[in-house]
Amino acid sequence: MTEVKTERPRPAAAAGGAQRRPFFRRRKTCPFSGEGAPKIDYKDIKLLSRFISERGKIVPSRITAVSAKKQRELAQAIKRARFLGLLPYVVK
């Protein structure tokens, strides 16, 4: 059997054309650290609801950019608020 190799055309940037600038992703900072940052409180439903998905799940820190320590505090506050009936467990 004879193997036939086909060469795909390369994009203009890889072929020696104009070089693309690499995409610069801005580093997110924790919304709970720094001056004037809100305190995590289980009674602050307006704040806690920003970190809950539309299905009622806790949004992960890689999306919200919350630090690991504050994410644990946030999860504990959300669970406390759910237990007291201030937040729903699931949204239908």
Curated annotation (Swiss-Prot):
Biased composition (Low complexity): 11-21
SUPFAM superfamilies xref list: Ribosomal protein S18
Basic and acidic residues bias spans: 1-10
Record-level Gene Ontology MF annotations: small ribosomal subunit rRNA binding; structural constituent of ribosome
InterPro entries (alphabetical): Ribosomal_bS18, Ribosomal_bS18_CS, Ribosomal_bS18_sf
Region (Disordered): 1-28
Gene3D superfamilies hit by this protein: Ribosomal protein S18
Domain of life: Bacteria
Keywords: Ribonucleoprotein, Ribosomal protein, RNA-binding, rRNA-binding
The keyword Metal-binding is assigned to this record: no
A GO biological-process term: translation
The protein's role, per its UniProt record: Binds as a heterodimer with protein bS6 to the central domain of the 16S rRNA, where it helps stabilize the platform of the 30S subunit.
PANTHER family, per the entry: 30S RIBOSOMAL PROTEIN S18 (PTHR13479), SMALL RIBOSOMAL SUBUNIT PROTEIN BS18M (PTHR13479:SF40)
Membership in a protein family: Belongs to the bacterial ribosomal protein bS18 family.
Subunit description: Part of the 30S ribosomal subunit. Forms a tight heterodimer with protein bS6.
Protein name: Small ribosomal subunit protein bS18
